[in-house]
Amino acid sequence: MADAETFAFQAEINQLLSLIINTFYSNKEIFLRELISNSSDALDKIRFESLTDKSKLDGQPELFIHIIPDKTNNTLTIIDSGIGMTKADLVNNLGTIARSGTKEFMEALAAGADVSMIGQFGVGFYSAYLVADKVVVTTKHNDDEQYVWESQAGGSFTVTRDTSGEALGRGTKMVLYLKEDQMEYIEERRLKDLVKKHSEFISYPISLWIEKTIEKEISDDEEEEEKKDEEGKVEEVDEEKEKEEKKKKKIKEVSHEWDLVNKQKPIWMRKPEEINKEEYAAFYKSLSNDWEEHLAVKHFSVEGQLEFKAILFVPKRAPFDLFDTKKKPNNIKLYVRRVFIMDNCEDIIPEYLGFVKGIVDSEDLPLNISRETLQQNKILKVIRKNLVKKCLELFFEIAENKEDYNKFYEAFSKNLKLGIHEDSQNRTKIAELLRYHSTKSGDELTSLKDYVTRMKEGQNDIFYITGESKKAVENSPFLEKLKKKGIEVLYMVDAIDEYAIGQLKEFEGKKLVSATKEGLKLDETEDEKKKKEELKEKFEGLCKVIKDVLGDKVEKVIVSDRVVDSPCCLVTGEYGWTANMERIMKAQALRDSSMGGYMSSKKTMEINPENSIMDELRKRADADKNDKSVKDLVLLLFETALLTSGFSLDEPNTFGSRIHRMLKLGLSIDDDDVVEADADMPPLEDDADAEGSKMEEVD
């Protein structure tokens, strides 16, 4: 062998290894699933490359996974004829470059997650150290020579060019030197059970090197020959007698052979009624690397002009990187006539359904399809349309069980709202799946459909309020009149609600109306209308004074018919941003600031004529519109209204000073008196004297 090069593990990987080695995990068996899954991925890659270039398979035409237990040396070997690794791949992928999931996986482990999640974070290879204290990887890639990677996980690993080992042709061979207490993993029965449990549905043959003992019957002719030689004489015997006396002898002969473990045909080729829940769960786990079972499954086939079979799964919880834009989703595996084509096919399902896992096997797509031609492919567009339809059907099936749907909605509500924003064709269908808290729903969530059935007589619109949290909006001044009239209001407190509701203008013919925007119209009796007109007239002067004081801060000041208890509130234009949307946009680091100028619409101040503060303010303003206290109070009211209406203050310090001034007034403290009192006090001669005099006073 050539000289070995030594490399240090990247710090995070080193941490991960010490965590895997030094912590007790009960389900160490998952290591085999992870290593077989890696082999399957490597085989997928070479098979895909060979579709366009057959010569890629010359080094090793067969595609397989072999498992060899060795009781003599206490090793377990896993060999695949996959794509193999170059020297650079070995160094980077197995030690020096941490994947994005390394840190997240360690954090998840620290938070009590199961070690079997390791595959979801892309660091499944290191699970080998759950059962082995030394791992040797020999690999051959078509573009490089054969190399050996070796490590006992002590902070470093070596890579050596393999000049003397057995030539692989192409692929990877992993030898695990098992720990003394992990010898169960060289037992044939145990290995077979593990492959059946976790890797039954891998689409390549997984063969186990098994020991076979055969009993052979042999006649004892040879023994007789030996005896004759020893005695040196031949006894004459009757032939018949000789035949009778000839005995048959049994001997045990040991042989080895490959035994195919995953004999099942692809699960999606079988009829749904023939498959039980456990089989679906096993297939889901092998497909997704999830340690939990799925929440729901949809197994269907489409026939006619276009033929394909598919199985779709909804997980129980959202993955840690659900909305990671850098990560390509690889949740739907695409097969063509049972041949795996690709697993991060972005065009097969819209982004908002990126959490759905599964497989699609098409009869019509060409085998040599590439990503570039896939985008233009009409067949794929039809498959995509069908998948979206079936996903939505599946969600409605989940919704039939309230408990399951609550789990689903908690994990994936953002995806549904993203669907409202992006998928105009299915918008009305997705809207039926939305759930919100409301002024009448208590701790339960309500659907838009249920809201419509509870609407009051004569109510034509669906009312909602957006905000930062349920707590922030449930006592909002915007809801006062609506609550008084017994009208239900939906709380939309997810940041993405603002975007979704911008697209969902109505539901079942009922317009969605924001309680925080101008133009809120509620049914009024003749008496109410008359009273409103009188109050408008009465408060006209105050409205003008407030507008003069606030200037450009507000567009107009009007008498409100939406606030009942609060003195005032600030509403936004019907087509501009709400206060909540303004908050969201300000929080975006890469926002287009020019857009904020025209989208954050001018505010309208609505005053409550029946509030005692407003009534007193009106009297003062009518008496003297230049009264300084009126100006101060108007500014204070405006700033508090900004806060209660969900806006942020541009000058919090000024607001703080105003509050302090009001506190002093309330406590009858005069600033001038405080200054004078300080001036009258004689300077202290000495600290010690001061302390002494204090002591004398106590005496």
UniProtKB/Swiss-Prot annotation:
One of its GO terms (biological process) is response to heat. CDD domains: HATPase_Hsp90-like. One of its GO terms (molecular function) is ATP-dependent protein folding chaperone. Induction: In contrast to other major heat shock proteins, this one is also expressed at normal growth temperatures. Levels increase only slightly after heat shock and also increase after salt treatment. It comes from the Eukaryota. The modification Phosphoserine is found at residue 219. Residues 219-228, 676-690 have a biased composition (Acidic residues). Residues 219-248, 676-699 are annotated as: Disordered. It is found in: Cytoplasm. The keyword Chaperone applies. GO terms for cellular component: cytosol; Golgi apparatus; nucleolus; plasma membrane; plastid; secretory vesicle. Its main location: cytoplasm. Keywords: ATP-binding, Chaperone, Cytoplasm, Immunity, Innate immunity, Nucleotide-binding, Phosphoprotein, Plant defense, Stress response. A motif (TPR repeat-binding) lies at residues 695-699. InterPro entries: HATPase_C_sf, Heat_shock_protein_90_CS, HSP90_C, Hsp90_fam, Hsp90_N, Ribosomal_Su5_D2-typ_SF. Present in all tissues. Most abundantly expressed in roots and floral bud clusters followed by flowers, young fruits and rosette leaves. ATP binds at residues 34, 38, 80, 85, 93, 99-101, 120-125, 172, 371. Functions as a holding molecular chaperone (holdase) which stabilizes unfolding protein intermediates and rapidly releases them in an active form once stress has abated. Functions as a folding molecular chaperone (foldase) that assists the non-covalent folding of proteins in an ATP-dependent manner. Regulates RPP4-mediated temperature-dependent cell death and defense responses. May assist SGT1B in the formation of SCF E3 ubiquitin ligase complexes that target the immune receptors SNC1, RPS2 and RPS4 for degradation, to regulate receptor levels and avoid autoimmunity. The TPR repeat-binding motif mediates interaction with TPR repeat-containing proteins. Belongs to the heat shock protein 90 family. PANTHER family: HEAT SHOCK PROTEIN 90 FAMILY MEMBER. Homodimer. Interacts with OEP61, OEP64 and OM64. Interacts with SNC1. This is Heat shock protein 90-3. It comes from Arabidopsis thaliana.
